[in-house]
């Protein structure tokens, strides 16, 4: 096993020597640490994690962002981290087998697998992988992510990759599903212009802040999705310092693209579609160039979120 879990009150183990003192600090009171084996790290690729409230459009956002990076000439790998394993659906036009599926077929003897058993090429050369997850109520999503990265390294599949995008299950911020943060440089939060998704975004921002104590991940900002307006997101940003970095409007054509098993870059080039494509390309360029400093926002307490947004 390449991921260790320890209650904060226990002495930590499995951290690299250089980070031992930081790992011993933990993420916060009462946290359970999901620690990486120091040998299981993604190499030189830029790594981004996409979080957000369940059903907010993370997979659509992740897939179109992956294509945008590929249009910029980058070699992209998208990793779906949801048991539904539909993150890469619009890229590959099908539900591909998960890492857990293929490992089970060989009784978890990973040396028997070939890269083509679990990595599939999607639209415009984007490489696609679905980590999957343990059966409901059992196991740890963080372990699954760790096994996935380990498998990629064993087959040298990260050596020719410029960008890795983790598309992460819903708004679960437990130690397991926060595991992609330990690999990432930046974590982006997808949110709509409504109370529920901003409430979830605030919780996720707190999880990112906790992980940033011990790892290199920093908050990249909020991607406003399925929203005509952004006034509530911007109001939240003014209070917390967590800025909006993109705005993807509430267009029916975006919903239809998923029904057609297409990314937005494959749809008919209407003015609406071209505008959204340009927004994705702009965002991908900014994420790659990383000219903006990381966000040092201050998430609010739950009660303060209600006071800020809940009683208008």
Curated annotation (Swiss-Prot):
It is an enzyme of class 1 (oxidoreductase). Transmembrane segments: none annotated. It comes from the Bacteria. SUPFAM superfamilies: P-loop containing nucleoside triphosphate hydrolases (SSF52540). It catalyses: chlorophyllide a + oxidized 2[4Fe-4S]-[ferredoxin] + 2 ADP + 2 phosphate = protochlorophyllide a + reduced 2[4Fe-4S]-[ferredoxin] + 2 ATP + 2 H2O. Keywords: 4Fe-4S, ATP-binding, Bacteriochlorophyll biosynthesis, Chlorophyll biosynthesis, Iron, Iron-sulfur, Magnesium, Metal-binding, Nucleotide-binding, Oxidoreductase, Photosynthesis. One of its GO terms (molecular function) is metal ion binding. ATP binds at residues 55-60, 84, 225-226, 249-251. Pfam families: Fer4_NifH. Its EC number is 1.3.7.7. [4Fe-4S] cluster binds at residues 140, 174. Its cofactor is [4Fe-4S] cluster. Belongs to the NifH/BchL/ChlL family. Homodimer. Protochlorophyllide reductase is composed of three subunits; BchL, BchN and BchB. Component of the dark-operative protochlorophyllide reductase (DPOR) that uses Mg-ATP and reduced ferredoxin to reduce ring D of protochlorophyllide (Pchlide) to form chlorophyllide a (Chlide). This reaction is light-independent. The L component serves as a unique electron donor to the NB-component of the complex, and binds Mg-ATP. This is Light-independent protochlorophyllide reductase iron-sulfur ATP-binding protein.
């Amino acid at each position: 096993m390449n991921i260790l879990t320890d209650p904060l009150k226990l002495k930590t183990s499995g951290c690299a020597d250089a980070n031992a003192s930081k790992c011993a600090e933990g993420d916060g009171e009462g946290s359970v640490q999901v620690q990486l084996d120091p040998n299981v790290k993604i190499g030189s690729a830029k790594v981004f994690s996409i979080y957000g409230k369940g059903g907010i459009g993370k997979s659509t956002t992740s897939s179109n962002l992956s294509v945008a990076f590929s249009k910029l000439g980058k070699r992209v790998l998208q990793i779906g981290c949801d048991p539904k394993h539909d993150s890469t659906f619009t890229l590959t036009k099908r539900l591909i087998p998960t890492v857990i599926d293929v490992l089970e077929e060989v009784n978890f003897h990973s040396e028997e697998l070939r890269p083509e058993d679990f990595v599939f090429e999607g639209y415009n050369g984007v490489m696609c992988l679905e980590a999957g997850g343990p059966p409901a109520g059992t196991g740890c999503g963080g372990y699954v992510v760790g096994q996935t990265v380990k498998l990629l390294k064993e087959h040298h599949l990260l050596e020719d990759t410029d960008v890795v995008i983790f598309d992460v299950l819903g708004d679960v911020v437990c130690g397991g599903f926060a595991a992609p943060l330990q690999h990432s440089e930046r974590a982006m939060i997808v949110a709509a212009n409504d109370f529920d998704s901003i409430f979830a975004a605030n919780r996720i921002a707190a999880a990112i802040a906790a992980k940033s104590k011990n790892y290199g991940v920093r908050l990249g900002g909020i991607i406003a999705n399925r929203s005509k307006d952004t006034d509530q997101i911007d109001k939240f940003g003014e209070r917390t310092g967590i800025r909006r970095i993109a705005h993807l409007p509430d267009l029916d054509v975006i919903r239809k693209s998923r029904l057609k098993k297409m990314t937005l870059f494959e749809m008919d080039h209407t003015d609406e579609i071209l505008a959204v494509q340009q927004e994705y390309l702009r965002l991908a360029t900014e994420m790659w160039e990383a000219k903006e400093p990381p966000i040092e926002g201050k998430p609010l307490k739950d009660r303060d979120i209600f006071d800020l947004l809940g009683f208008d």
